[in-house]
Amino acid sequence: MLEHFCECYSNLSGLILCPVLGSITPLFIPNSRIRPIRLIGLCASLITFLYSPVPRIQFDSSTAKSQFVESLRWLPYENINFYLGIDGISLFFVILTTFLIPICISVGWSGMRSYGKEYITAFLIREFLMIAVFRMLDLLLFYVFPESVPIPMFIIIGVWGSRQRKIKAAYQFFLYTLLGSLFMLLAILLILFQTGTTDLQISLTTEFSERRQIFLWIASFASFAVKVPMVPVHIWLPEAHVEAPTAGSVILAGIPLKFGTHGFLRFSIPMFPEATLCSTPFIYTLSAIAIIYTSLTTSRQIDLKKIIAYSSVAHMNLVTIGMFSPNIQGIGGSILPMLSHGLVPSALFLCVGVLYDRHKTRLVRYYGGLVSTMPNLSTIFFSFTLANMSSPGTSSFIGEFPILVGAFQRNSLVATLAALGMILGAAYSLWLYNRVVSGNLKPDFLHKFSDSNGREVSIFIPFLVGLVRMGVHPKVFPDCMHTSVSNLVQHGKFH
């Protein structure tokens, strides 16, 4: 039995089992004992995070094949298995997921008095589902896990949201993702009928006719575009962010927005290369419009959370430009901004959460002069503002610069529009910081509150370390990803 246990952990089953066990245990504890419930949730998430870098130590970056593969029969049908693995692309997204969950639990530490164990259970189940999303190698799981993630998020927004419109935002978020996923289910069924299996590796080697490729690509695009999100199916994101609690916004910005781009990388691009090349002008046009539109829309917002939400849409559409530049620079460069995007908007939402806890408003017009009353938070806010505007030395710059290089090789006009979007991003980021931090304090609206406390600063430090680490010495990421990205480009005959 001990050998089986060790084998399970060597195959990364622990990354899935730990949050599952952590989510079940609090259900047997009375709601009145909130402290042990908090500690169980935090310990389960921390153990998962501390274990998540282990695959990086054992990972063989010289091969593009999936590693730490696990297969288990879970349905009474042949060729449909619980099939999980990990490669150079998904490795760091698993680590990012396990990094954010302990922070989300810590952020909700003081607000966990009502429905405490439900709060812990929702976040840990969400962690299990998100880890599984990045490890799945089965097409049916490719549908089941991403479409299960919105369920705990629906509960998080609907129960712990901050305003009366939270129910509407929760339903809007859930319905958008549900309707988009139906097209993905149709595509998976058609692939199953042709290949006779849901094994992703086998499906990737299957030759589809050009007409079938185009149809399947459109079906998958309809699902992934909602998750990115791309214009015009982005409306759900600002509403969900505004109504979600701080921890909900952190995890929503950090992980689920990557499901769409991860789906393009894992499914649409390698499986339908001809359709991908045919659709590249469409994706370029749609992404460029989204970048300019959302950047201009951001400058007109009055809610701090909506500003960050629209900024996220612009950054993620820049990622899609790189992803559909059929070269190593574009595809490889698009992965780093996805990781960076898991840190920067999440940290900015934390900053807004600190302000909201003290002043009970997120409207920009009520803020100003915070540098005199909250110098620590102002400095932290400035650091993440620099990252949001892709300043050199930050993680955002390291990823977005290769995207522009790859896009220029494909379409100089689209690359120019993307660069213009980055300039607009710098403009609204500095405008926001200036409005909130500089100027005179408005005593009629804001009272003098204490600066960030030790718990809040300790939550920000890992984000700062991650941003600087990725920005100054990002070599570890391309080393692990290069073989997987090269294989993807060669498999699609993009070179």
UniProtKB/Swiss-Prot annotation:
One of its GO terms (biological process) is aerobic respiration. It is found in: Mitochondrion membrane. InterPro entries: NADH_Q_OxRdtase_chainM/4, NADH_UbQ_OxRdtase, ND/Mrp_TM. It catalyses: a ubiquinone + NADH + 5 H(+)(in) = a ubiquinol + NAD(+) + 4 H(+)(out). GO terms for cellular component: mitochondrial membrane; plastid; respiratory chain complex I. It comes from the Eukaryota. The keyword NADP does not apply. It is a multi-pass membrane protein. Its EC number is 7.1.1.2. It is an enzyme of class 7 (translocase). The chain crosses the membrane at residues 9-29, 39-59, 89-109, 139-159, 173-193, 214-234, 272-292, 313-333, 335-355, 367-387, 413-433. Keywords: Electron transport, Membrane, Mitochondrion, NAD, Respiratory chain, Translocase, Transmembrane, Transmembrane helix, Transport, Ubiquinone. One of its GO terms (molecular function) is NADH dehydrogenase (ubiquinone) activity. Pfam families: Proton_antipo_M. Core subunit of the mitochondrial membrane respiratory chain NADH dehydrogenase (Complex I) that is believed to belong to the minimal assembly required for catalysis. Complex I functions in the transfer of electrons from NADH to the respiratory chain. The immediate electron acceptor for the enzyme is believed to be ubiquinone. PANTHER family: NADH-UBIQUINONE OXIDOREDUCTASE CHAIN 4 (PTHR43507:SF1). Belongs to the complex I subunit 4 family. This is NADH-ubiquinone oxidoreductase chain 4.
